[in-house]
UniProtKB/Swiss-Prot annotation:
This is Cell division cycle 20.2, cofactor of APC complex. The APC/C is composed of at least 11 subunits that stay tightly associated throughout the cell cycle. Interacts with APC10, FZR1, FZR2, FZR3. Part of the mitotic checkpoint complex (MCC); interacts with MAD2, BUB3.1, BUBR1 and BUB1. Binds to cyclins CYCA1-2, CYCB2-1 and CYCB2-2. PANTHER family: CELL DIVISION CYCLE 20 CDC20 FIZZY -RELATED, FI02843P. The gene is CDC20-2. Its main location: nucleus. It comes from Arabidopsis thaliana (Mouse-ear cress). Pathway: Protein modification; protein ubiquitination. One of its GO terms (biological process) is protein ubiquitination. One of its GO terms (cellular component) is nucleus. It is found in: Nucleus. InterPro entries: Cdc20/Fizzy, WD40/YVTN_repeat-like_dom_sf, WD40_CDC20-Fz, WD40_repeat_CS, WD40_repeat_dom_sf, WD40_rpt. Keywords: Cell cycle, Cell division, Mitosis, Nucleus, Repeat, Ubl conjugation pathway, WD repeat. WD repeats lie at residues 128-165, 170-209, 213-250, 254-293, 302-344, 346-387, 390-429.
């Protein structure tokens, strides 16, 4: 589909018109701004000069006249004034303080420009429109993986090339989740038949299949070094050590319905899980045991709808953001050390996904009905910085580029869009001040 034909170019910014009181169409003087005494003097001075031509003014009198005119500001006074003079600025500080302020101006960080439209759009036909699945991920090698029905495609952001990784058999599919390993080479693929396949993207070779742990589809995946955590419709969360023959090392039981969100913290010590039972669990890796069912560290029950959107803060330890579904519509912030809810913000619509900026104190959320938008928030004030529109269906999936600048979003409208929303970090600007932006100005098909 040629989505690019519907894109609107950047609108030219027009300056606002001046106040209508100043847009005068006739040259009618403003009487309140006129000095009638000086006007009479100026108009009659030349005639008086002719009548008194015999009288020769001395140099001292001429100098006195000029000095008097300068003092009274007569040389700069118009006879016909069409508007009032602007009011003189009020001196709020003593002159010595004012001078010091002019000598040391305060530096103000310019506001970052945030494009309101997507920079690139790829066609994503047959993407499964299911809130509980996770079908998009961007690996550390700058390759984006997306599952379209039974097929997994890889899009190389560095070259713009597209390749097919695997097409799953009908009896096993469709693909229900996908997640890159930290090395950016190996990718896990969750299936509708409860299996998880591990693939080498460099050689397009299947390495192994994990099965027997779940009884139904695997809708969420999360890597923690060599541990692959899987979440199923059966409510189970399983830690798999992919290095060993019998991979299951821990099983977490706490959700009563499908596990639709999984995220490990940056330290790898805590796991957040969200489910269709409206519950968020925090699990501690240090107390996990393979001998018995592991108890959660915190059980968070404040949401009133399914919790799929989970995001650990990159700049503040133990800070977790969670988003609720259509019956909840809130973003909540948690201290996972104490289990306390720090803040709750009503977004007005279903929260499908959350991403923290790696470079700024900002949070991006994707939403469903009615606007199907991406909203950028300033943290911790939670003031809206921008709303990005373009999708015509709920924005179910988001993924962030390795450099943290670009976000990819996929929706039920069968489009994959790229947004330059988070900006370039200051370190990258200093290292490459003349970097050329990627040519995100046309539309390609992903297959």
């Amino acid at each position: 589909m040629d989505a690019g034909l519907n894109r609107c170019p950047l609108q030219e910014h027009f300056l606002p018109r001046k106040n209508s009181k100043e847009n005068l169409d006739r040259f009618i003087p403003n009487r309140s701004a006129m000095n009638f005494d000086y006007a009479h003097f100026a108009l009659t001075e030349e005639r008086k000069g002719k009548d008194q031509s015999a009288t020769v003014s001395s140099p001292s009198k001429e100098a006195y006249r000029k000095q008097l005119a300068e003092t009274m500001n007569l040389n700069h006074t118009r006879i016909l004034a069409f508007r009032n003079k602007p009011q003189a600025p009020v001196e709020l500080l003593p002159s010595n303080h004012s001078a010091s302020l002019h000598q040391q101006p305060k530096s103000v960080k310019p506001r970052r420009y945030i494009p309101q439209t997507s920079e690139r759009t790829l066609d994503a036909p047959d993407i499964v429109d299911d809130f509980y699945l996770n079908l998009l991920d961007w690996g550390s090698a700058n390759v984006l993986a997306i599952a379209l029905d039974h097929t997994v495609y890889l899009w190389d952001a560095s070259t713009g090339s597209t390749s097919e990784l695997v097409t799953i058999d009908e009896e096993k599919g469709p693909v229900t989740s996908i997640n890159w390993a930290p090395d950016g080479r190996h990718v896990a693929v969750g299936l509708n038949n409860s299996e998880v396949q591990l693939w080498d993207s460099a050689s397009n070779r299947q390495l192994r299949t994990l099965k027997g742990g779940h009884q139904s589809r695997v809708g969420s995946l999360a890597w923690n070094n060599h541990i692959l955590t899987t979440g199923g419709m059966d409510g189970l969360i399983i830690n798999n050590d992919v290095r060993i023959r019998s991979p299951i090392v821990e099983t977490y039981r706490g959700h009563t319905q499908e596990v639709c969100g999984l995220k490990w913290s940056g330290s790898g010590q805590q796991l957040a899980s969200g489910g269709n039972d409206n519950v968020v669990h925090i699990w501690d890796r240090s107390v996990a045991s393979s001998n018995s069912t592991t108890q959660w560290l915190h059980r968070l029950e404040e949401h009133t709808s399914a919790v799929k959107a989970l995001a650990w803060c990159p700049f503040q330890a133990n800070l977790l953001a969670t988003g609720g579904g259509g019956g909840d519509r809130t973003i909540k912030f948690w201290n996972t050390h104490t289990g306390a809810c720090l803040n709750s913000v009503d977004t007005g619509s279903q929260v499908c996904s959350l991403l923290w900026s790696k470079n700024e104190r900002e949070l991006l959320s994707s939403h469903g009905f009615t606007q199907n938008q991406l909203t950028l928030w300033k943290y911790p004030s939670m003031v809206k910085m921008a709303e990005l529109t373009g999708h015509t269906s709920r924005v179910l999936y988001m993924a962030q580029s390795p450099d943290g600048c670009t976000v990819a979003s996929a929706a039920g409208d069968e489009t994959l869009r790229f947004w330059n929303v988070f900006g370039v970090p200051e370190t990258a600007k200093k290292a490459a001040p003349k970097a050329v932006a990627e040519p995100f100005s046309h539309v390609n098909r992903i297959r």
